């Protein structure tokens, strides 16, 4: 890469301060709004059954391109885009309620009831939707941020501040924590069987982390050898997000032993966040991370990645705490005290600036509060428009699969099932585009054409993997 252009690229994503949380909420609300319109079309008109070309294109427009437009063309008017999405949904609801009430989500009457291990852990379409929407906006943002059509206030803040991409990084980790609760719940259901020792669990988690750590090494090698533009203050000289993701499972297993003494992942998450924040405020750790010169040792060169890992660990544990509550039976009124606690903690942490670079306590609380709100919205949409998903607890697995398939976008299902592979492809395509296209000098029309093509390609990869029944999720 040309040295002058590389310097311009690095300056383009440096020293940014982010934007307002209200605007971030408005932009991210596009995902639930799109799912709301999709759900109305499906529950009232069965528009996506069968899933032909028209259904595929509409699905792509609603669940992928709407998010792309929210972060580009409609970045200055996200509320307008939300209105454009929900208005037709309400019109359909008003005109079809009486005619479609009895058929909007009628469960099939074929399979017999099944019981056994895992029967109390139903499939939740809203969890699939939530994780897939997060994956889509992440994949879009990692390439869009290199174009001028993507507002700078959405890019990662340098030291302090809130931005869309700052939230995306934490949400990626939080969602991983949510789904990790399923394995914990299943192991607790099998209480009679011999439990694995800490060493066995730790070894197993390391094996699962190896692919992510390998990807981290591949990315490190590629960036250094291709002279790719890099933002060193993001994670450090050698560290990258794949390393953070890869080291989380083994460290979480170490906390699993503590969970027997403190049987609350909420408390564990908060304890990690608070202790880390105390260290930041009462020692020189904060200034060491933010302003100290980089020494020759590995810790100094990668201090952002190493120490922010503690914040991401707290976020992962917070996600697992949420998963432990919602996976067994969805979101219910009994879970509202948890929401109240998070609101109180968010207000308490508001006196300290949010820092994604530090992954400090306010950042942890912001990410947890946002993701709980998103889960609530997706669950609310599902509960209202697909009530049969939450009924017939004694029906068989075949019935459950048919009901969940009816209530879930095929594109969102594909992104959720192929999460790791899609994220890898998105990173490879982002690198390829940046090495072949002068993204800083591209006009808006060409930038949007590239981004739409990129979105279509990663969607095609996700659908192809799902069609081949290949599951490589994060």
UniProtKB/Swiss-Prot annotation:
Glycosylation sites: 15
Protein's cellular compartments: Endoplasmic reticulum membrane
Entry GO MF terms: glucosaminyl-phosphatidylinositol O-acyltransferase activity
Keyword Endoplasmic reticulum: yes
GO biological process, one term: GPI anchor biosynthetic process
Record GO cellular component, one term: endoplasmic reticulum membrane
Bilayer-spanning residue ranges: 21-41, 54-74, 75-95, 125-145, 160-180, 304-324, 361-381, 420-440, 447-467
Membrane topology, record value: Multi-pass membrane protein
Pathway assignment: Glycolipid biosynthesis; glycosylphosphatidylinositol-anchor biosynthesis
UniProt KW keywords: Acyltransferase, Endoplasmic reticulum, Glycoprotein, GPI-anchor biosynthesis, Membrane, Transferase, Transmembrane, Transmembrane helix
Enzyme Commission number, as recorded: 2.3.-.-
Glycoprotein listed as a keyword: yes
Database matches in InterPro entries: PIGW/GWT1 (IPR009447)
Homology family: Belongs to the PIGW family.
Biological function: Probable acetyltransferase, which acetylates the inositol ring of phosphatidylinositol during biosynthesis of GPI-anchor.
Annotated PANTHER family: PHOSPHATIDYLINOSITOL-GLYCAN BIOSYNTHESIS CLASS W PROTEIN
Protein name per Swiss-Prot or TrEMBL: GPI-anchored wall transfer protein 1
Gene: gwt1
């Amino acid at each position: 890469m040309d040295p002058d252009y590389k310097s311009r690229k690095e300056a383009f994503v440096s020293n940014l301060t982010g934007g307002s949380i209200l605007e971030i909420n408005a932009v991210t609300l596009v995902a639930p709004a799109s799912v709301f319109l999709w759900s109305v079309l499906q529950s009232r008109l069965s528009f996506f059954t069968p899933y032909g070309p028209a259904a595929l294109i509409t699905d792509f427009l609603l669940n992928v391109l709407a998010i792309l437009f929210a972060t580009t063309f409609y970045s200055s008017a996200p509320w307008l885009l939300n209105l454009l999405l929900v208005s037709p949904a309400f019109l359909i609801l008003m005109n079809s309620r009486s005619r479609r009430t009895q058929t909007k989500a009628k469960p099939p009457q074929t399979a017999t009831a099944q019981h056994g291990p895992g029967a109390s852990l139903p499939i939740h379409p809203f969890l699939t939707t939530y994780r897939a929407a997060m994956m889509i906006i992440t994949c879009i943002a990692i390439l869009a941020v290199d174009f001028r059509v993507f507002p700078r206030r959405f890019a990662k803040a340098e030291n302090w501040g809130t931005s869309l991409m700052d939230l995306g990084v934490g949400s990626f980790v939080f969602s991983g924590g949510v789904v990790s609760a399923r394995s914990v719940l299943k192991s607790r259901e099998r209480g009679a069987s011999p439990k694995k020792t800490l060493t066995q669990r730790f070894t197993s988690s390391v094996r699962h982390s190896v692919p992510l750590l390998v990807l981290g090494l591949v990315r490190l090698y590629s960036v250094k050898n291709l002279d790719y533009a890099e933002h060193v203050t993001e994670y450090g000289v050698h560290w990258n997000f794949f390393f953070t993701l890869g080291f989380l499972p083994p460290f979480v297993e170490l906390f699993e032993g503590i969970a027997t003494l403190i049987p609350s992942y909420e408390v564990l998450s908060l304890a990690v966040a608070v202790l880390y924040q105390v260290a930041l405020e009462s020692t020189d750790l904060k200034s060491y991370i933010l302003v100290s010169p980089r020494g020759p040792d590995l810790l100094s060169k990668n201090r952002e990645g190493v120490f922010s890992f503690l914040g991401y660990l707290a976020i992962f544990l917070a996600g697992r705490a949420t998963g432990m509550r919602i996976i067994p039976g969805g979101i219910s009124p009994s879970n509202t005290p948890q929401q109240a606690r998070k609101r109180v903690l968010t207000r308490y942490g508001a006196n300290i600036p949010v820092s994604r670079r530090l992954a400090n306590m306010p950042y942890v609380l912001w990410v947890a509060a946002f993701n709980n709100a998103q889960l609530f919205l997706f669950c609310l949409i599902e509960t209202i428009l697909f009530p049969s998903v939450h009924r017939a607890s004694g029906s068989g697995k075949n019935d459950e699969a048919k009901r969940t398939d009816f209530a879930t976008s095929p594109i969102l299902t594909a992104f959720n099932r192929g999460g790791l592979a899609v994220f890898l492809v998105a990173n490879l395509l982002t690198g390829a585009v940046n090495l072949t296209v002068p993204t800083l000098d591209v006009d808006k029309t060409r930038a949007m054409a590239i981004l739409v093509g990129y979105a279509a390609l990663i969607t095609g990869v996700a659908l192809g993997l799902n069609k081949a029944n290949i599951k490589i999720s994060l």
